[in-house]
Amino acid sequence: MKNNKKAFEEACEYIAGGVDSPVRAFASVGSNPLFIKKGKGAYISDIEDNTYIDYVQSWGPLLFGHCDEDVEKACKKALEHGSSFGAPTLAETKLAKFILQDWPHLDKIRFVSSGTEATMSAIRLARGFSKKDKIIKFEGCYHGHSDSLLVSAGSGAATFNTPSSLGVLEDVAKNTLVAIYNDIDSVKNLVEKHSDIACIIIEPIAGNMGLVPAKKEFLQELQALCKKHQILLIFDEVMSGFRASYLGSYGIYNIQADIVTFGKVIGGGMPAAAFAARAEIMDLLSPLGGVYQAGTLSGNPLAMASGYASLKKARNYEGLYEKLEKLGKRLTQGLKEAANDCKIPLQVNCVGSMFGFFFCENPVNNYQDALKSDTKLFAKFHAQMLSKGIYLAPSQFETGFICESMDKKIIEKTIQAAQESFKTL
């Protein structure tokens, strides 16, 4: 049996960088990645048969943990009839109706296979609807790896109007304006200078600079500004949708965006995402309108079955989100108390089943605040926690997730591990 180090060395021979998504390489924490062979509930096991409490949960999709029986059953039943047809199925309509019933400002939806596709398509749709070119995004918010949105992204350099990746053309980046998260004046300044803004896209609960929720007043002012200047407001709820609450940020702030993107939880662990809006906007999509979007595996029956099973269970589970939030708040409270006992500065954020923490003195409200976190200290903490069986995201600038399979005992075990880890820093 290979160990993790040898498995990574072999992967690097055949897979670019040894991984299919950069953060998985553990580069930011200075170690080798774990190769996971199985998971059940709140736990995962690597190829060396080490078991960990998993706070990554596949980066958010697994609301009920690994191998949930209801989701597995739905997938197996769907697979009996075929994995993909490239044709309409009743499963797509079933999931679409189920999602839209609770979002009064969204009339129609279209499924895709990834969050990147969802946000990319939403931007194209907004430009097609408004007949304007420029967009505004926020420093530190990540909306996938399409060219227009890889500007001052969560993982890139915080530089105004500068691509965060080689291969992104300056001619593309120049149409992406960057504002400061939770700072309405920075948005107003851009709107005053540019008359051709098609849309403003934001993570209302940002999860890619660590967890940083928007302030309600800021979102209210943002919505008012968009209405005043006829700019479409896009809420990227790929991470927060059905996670922060059943209705994502809408269930918390009660603010309606013009276009909303979904992902992660709506696939229940299978590749699925979506974007939705009122009919006037959505009917511009081909084949009805002139905005083109397509995908071979979009709406595939396995993902639709998995997503429906997960969302139906979440919607019908009385007290689910209260339980998850209670566990999340206890965890972050325990982490902060443990850090304080060791005189280590730690800021914590928790929204529903999403949480984050930063090794810095002051509260984190935007990307520049997040960058003040001591990433070297985080790397040491991450290694200590991993050695104690706690699997955290291998980056300071990622969000952690609570799943339904977790309980108070698991949370207290994690806090105990943190107490021991802080003492070594």
From Swiss-Prot:
Main localization, broad class: cytoplasm
Cell compartment(s), UniProt: Cytoplasm
Pfam families: Aminotran_3 (PF00202)
A GO term from the CC aspect: cytoplasm
Pathway(s) per entry: Porphyrin-containing compound metabolism; protoporphyrin-IX biosynthesis; 5-aminolevulinate from L-glutamyl-tRNA(Glu): step 2/2
Cofactors named for this entry: pyridoxal 5'-phosphate
Key word Cytoplasm present: yes
Catalytic reaction equation(s): (S)-4-amino-5-oxopentanoate = 5-aminolevulinate
Keywords carried by this UniProt record: Cytoplasm, Isomerase, Porphyrin biosynthesis, Pyridoxal phosphate
GO-annotated biological processes: protoporphyrinogen IX biosynthetic process
Residue numbers of N6-(pyridoxal phosphate)lysine PTMs: K264
Its EC number(s): 5.4.3.8
UniProt GO molecular function: glutamate-1-semialdehyde 2,1-aminomutase activity; pyridoxal phosphate binding; transaminase activity
Cell cycle keyword on record: no
Similarity section: Belongs to the class-III pyridoxal-phosphate-dependent aminotransferase family. HemL subfamily.
Subunit annotation: Homodimer.
PANTHER family with a match to the protein in the record: GLUTAMATE-1-SEMIALDEHYDE 2,1-AMINOMUTASE, GLUTAMATE-1-SEMIALDEHYDE 2,1-AMINOMUTASE 1, CHLOROPLASTIC-RELATED
Protein name as annotated: Glutamate-1-semialdehyde 2,1-aminomutase
Name of the gene encoding the protein in the UniProt record: hemL
